[in-house]
UniProtKB/Swiss-Prot annotation:
Similarity comment: Belongs to the RNA 3'-terminal cyclase family. Type 1 subfamily.
Function (record text): Catalyzes the conversion of 3'-phosphate to a 2',3'-cyclic phosphodiester at the end of RNA. The mechanism of action of the enzyme occurs in 3 steps: (A) adenylation of the enzyme by ATP; (B) transfer of adenylate to an RNA-N3'P to produce RNA-N3'PP5'A; (C) and attack of the adjacent 2'-hydroxyl on the 3'-phosphorus in the diester linkage to produce the cyclic end product. Likely functions in some aspects of cellular RNA processing. Function plays an important role in regulating axon regeneration by inhibiting central nervous system (CNS) axon regeneration following optic nerve injury.
EC number, as in UniProt: 6.5.1.4
Binding-site list for ATP: Q104, P131, Y294, D297, Q298, H320
Domain of life according to the entry: Eukaryota
Record-given protein name: RNA 3'-terminal phosphate cyclase
Alphabetical list of Pfam families matching this protein: RTC, RTC_insert
InterPro entries reported in the protein's UniProt record: RNA3'-term_phos_cycl_insert, RNA3'_phos_cyclase_dom, RNA3'_phos_cyclase_dom_sf, RNA3'_term_phos_cyc, RNA3'_term_phos_cyc_type_1, RNA3'_term_phos_cycl-like_CS, RNA3'P_cycl/enolpyr_Trfase_a/b, RPTC_insert
Native organism: Pongo abelii
Catalytic residue list: H320 (tele-amp-histidine intermediate)
Catalysed reactions, semicolon-separated: a 3'-end 3'-phospho-ribonucleotide-RNA + ATP = a 3'-end 2',3'-cyclophospho-ribonucleotide-RNA + AMP + diphosphate
Disulfide bonds: none
PROSITE patterns linked to this entry: RTC (PS01287)
Length: 366
């Protein structure tokens, strides 16, 4: 697909892998040739890392595109997309690079393919600096499906830092268009639940301690809440390596979902891991928003593509979200307005409304 190349500065704003994910996904969807320069320029190890490379190669293969400059450490790539196709698409970070971030870049694209897709993703399922697969399934999935599509996510094996080795299969069918969403009514918290897991050689007591510490911490602030956090020993054949972590979800009367999560590290006791997740959840409940700080930016591309006006209510707008908006406006020409919520209750809490006039992307194949 010919046309002028869209020029992206990979060092601005969030300045990391997210710029690559948003810009290449939109380039692929819109058939716009792309050049990204200064990739991760401000990071301690600039340029492409293995997980970025596997994401780029996956997008290239999704649309039989051309990709130049794609090697570890490269700070500039050019990408020329062709037609998006369904079928089986595979990506392997060969490290603990996050499978959830591979989903972020590929899912919007295969929604506009000609036929159903199966994404076979390998890497870390529960990795630092990325959503945990539990978050993707328990929070991201039910909310993003409000845009008018469904997907199936089958966790074959869990993989942890530093080895990775996780495996996830995502199945989804294409859509004609995406519906806009209106997520502005939070309602009140009706239940709090989650899972605290251990895998490999770690004793089950660690899972129980994480769950108990998290529940205690939550009950201090939300006194009458029923907190149901299940301790789980992952089956040996479904987890690769040693790890522990916890995710806690708060669900509201209007179907909003908020999460707090934490992963264990060597030398950090179980109570501290549990309390870390609980405090993150409580922080996300203190603002008046309808999505938590980690869901904000993951919805921006879908809002940009949708056919109509979408609105979401958030707490403080994160740098990741500001970055996604910047590139959705630059590349897709979607129009965003971010303003403080006018609701009196929200004003004191730093609550915002993100509104987007989507471009009404239509699947040419359907």
């Amino acid at each position: 697909m010919a046309g002028p190349r869209v020029e992206v500065d990979g060092s601005i704003m969030e300045g990391g892998g997210q710029i690559l994910r948003v810009s290449t996904a939109l380039s692929c969807l819109l058939g716009l040739p792309l050049r990204v320069q200064k990739i991760r320029a401000g990071r301690s190890t600039p340029g492409l890392r293995p997980q970025h490379l596997s994401g780029l190669e996956m997008i290239r293969d999704l649309c039989d595109g051309q990709l130049e400059g794609a090697e570890i450490g490269s700070t500039e790539i050019t990408f020329t997309p062709e037609k998006i196709k369904g079928g089986i698409h595979t990506a392997d970070t060969k490290t603990a690079g996050s499978v959830c971030l591979l989903m972020q870049v590929s899912m919007p694209c295969v929604l506009f393919a000609a036929s159903p897709s199966k994404l076979h993703l390998k890497g870390g399922t529960n990795a630092e600096m990325a959503p945990q697969i539990d978050y993707t399934v328990m929070v991201f999935k039910p909310i993003v499906e409000k845009f008018g599509f469904v997907f199936n996510c089958d966790i074959k094996t869990r993989g942890y830092y530093p080895k990775g080795g996780g495996e996830v299969i995502v199945r989804m069918s294409p859509v004609k268009q995406l519906d806009p969403v209106n997520l502005t009514d939070r309602g009140c918290v009706t239940k709090i639940y989650g899972r605290a897991f251990v895998t490999g050689v770690l004793p089950f007591k660690v899972a129980k301690d994480m769950a108990a510490a998290a529940a205690r911490c939550i009950r201090k602030e939300i006194r009458d809440s029923y907190v149901n956090i299940q301790p789980v020993q992952e089956p040996k054949d479904q987890a690769f390596g040693n790890g522990n972590g916890i995710i806690i979800i708060a669900e509201t009367s209007t179907g909003c979902l908020f999460a707090g999560s934490s992963l264990g590290k060597r030398g950090v006791n179980a109570d501290k891991v549990g309390i870390g997740a609980a405090e993150m959840l409580l922080a996300n409940l203190r603002h008046g928003g309808t999505v938590d700080e980690y869901l904000q930016d993951q919805l921006i591309v879908f809002m940009a593509l949708a056919n109509g006006v979408s609105r979401i209510k958030t707490g403080p707008v994160t740098l990741h979200t500001q970055t996604a908006i910047h590139f959705a406006e630059q590349i897709a020409k979607a129009k965003f307005i971010v303003k403080k919520s006018e609701d009196e209750e929200d004003a004191a809490k730093g609550t915002y409304i993100i509104e987007c006039q989507g471009i009404g992307m239509t699947n040419p194949n359907l």
